């Protein structure tokens, strides 16, 4: 089964059965002479889905902005949820919401700009998305192109007019899986694996399907492998030489036995972190504070855990009849 993270209604899945059958063009290379880091403070953009009678799909998505310095949470708006899984991004550059939406039979899911509650289509070459993140004057996405299979790392300019495939795989076998930003270095850290190896590992509990951790420099568009592990990665964050991983042995049931590790990227040595949380999803690291989607006891939500003081803040708790789909650290 294709490993795209979805929280989706049967109606939406039916709509998307033919979403990726259209014609596509190669993604054009991006032309950016410099990529100065946006001076705005890093922030979280959060997506939370809910049932909506106003939407054709019966669901909608809320987009939230969280100021990590002021520790203030604000809902920025709502959009229809028609894509395979809800994905929103609040941009501090134009005070607008970007979101993924179903574009029509054979046309896949595309990125739209919510412009006075109307959707302005910004892309036409994609099929699906796992991530959309603001990185200074650019956007990073983990996306699937029309007529392709795997999720790739893609960098787009501020208007989505020029995009580049920064880690092209001729075999179309490499999945870009977990993603996080490294704002102070203007970089993206992400894990990737071979889909064929992962399928084989699913057949044998604890089977070997190595994951590689790569660092993408958004200024040069160059990638570098910084770490490798035999484990399945279900969470990643990085700052400086500190890499935080949520991982587990491969296999359908053994993946539930995940643990959190801190890796020194200079020495490649790892130590297990025993945190009072259950983390098995998106993470981010900034000023030695670990932001993550997980559980504290029976309460699922987004938390901020200070790795130095061991204190934590609750950013958002899940509420009845709504589901926190994910977040991203943007700048």
Please place each PLM-identified region on the residue numbering.
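Repeated scaffold domains used in trafficking and secretory/extracellular systems
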Residues: 30-37, 82-93, 125-137, 173-183, ...
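C-terminal motif of bacterial Sec signal peptides marking the signal peptidase cleavage site
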Residues: 16-19
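Blade-level signature of beta-propeller repeat domains, shared across WD40, Kelch, NHL, RCC1
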Residues: 301-303, 308-331
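Beta-propeller fold detector
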Residues: 73-80, 121-127, 163-169, 224-228, ...
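Short loop/turn segments that connect beta-strands within beta-propeller blades
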Residues: 68-71, 114-119, 157-161, 217-221, ...
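Residue position within the beta-strands of beta-propeller blades
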Residues: 44-48, 99-100, 140-143, 189-192, ...
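Short, conserved, GDST-rich strand-edge loop motifs in beta-rich repeat architectures
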Residues: 44-58, 145, 190-208, 248-255
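An edge-strand/N-cap motif at the start of beta-rich repeat modules
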Residues: 24-73
């Amino acid at each position: 089964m294709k490993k795209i993270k979805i929280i989706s209604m049967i109606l939406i899945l039916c709509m998307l059965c033919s979403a990726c059958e259209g014609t596509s063009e190669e993604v054009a290379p991006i032309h950016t002479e410099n990529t100065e880091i946006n001076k705005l403070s890093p922030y979280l953009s959060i997506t939370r889905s809910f049932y909506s009678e106003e939407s054709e799909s019966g669901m909608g998505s809320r987009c939230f902005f969280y100021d990590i310095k002021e520790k203030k949470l604000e809902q920025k708006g709502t959009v229809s949820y028609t894509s395979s899984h809800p994905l929103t991004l609040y941009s501090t550059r134009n005070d607008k919401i970007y979101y993924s939406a179903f574009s029509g039979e054979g046309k896949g899911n595309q990125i739209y700009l919510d412009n006075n509650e109307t959707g302005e289509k910004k892309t036409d070459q994609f099929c699906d998305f796992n991530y959309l993140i603001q990185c200074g004057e650019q956007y990073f996405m983990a996306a699937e192109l029309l007529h392709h299979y795997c999720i790739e790392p893609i960098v787009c300019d501020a208007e989505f007019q020029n995009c580049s495939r920064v880690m092209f795989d001729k075999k179309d076998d490499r999945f870009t899986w977990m993603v996080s930003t490294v704002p102070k270095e203007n970089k993206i850290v992400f894990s990737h694996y071979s889909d064929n190896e992962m399928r084989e590992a699913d057949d044998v509990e604890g089977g070997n399907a190595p994951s590689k951790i790569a660092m993408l420099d958004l200024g040069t568009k160059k990638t570098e492998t910084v770490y490798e592990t035999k484990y399945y990665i279900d969470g990643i964050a990085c700052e400086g030489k500190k890499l935080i991983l949520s991982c587990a042995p491969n296999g359908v049931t053994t993946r539930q036995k995940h643990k959190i590790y801190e890796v020194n990227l200079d020495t490649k040595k790892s130590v297990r972190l025993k945190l009072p949380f259950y983390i098995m999803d998106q993470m981010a690291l900034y000023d030695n504070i670990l932001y993550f989607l997980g559980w504290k006891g029976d309460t699922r939500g987004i938390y901020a855990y200070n790795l130095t003081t061991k204190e934590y803040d609750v950013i958002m708790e899940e509420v009845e009849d709504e589901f926190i789909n994910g977040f991203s650290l943007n700048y």
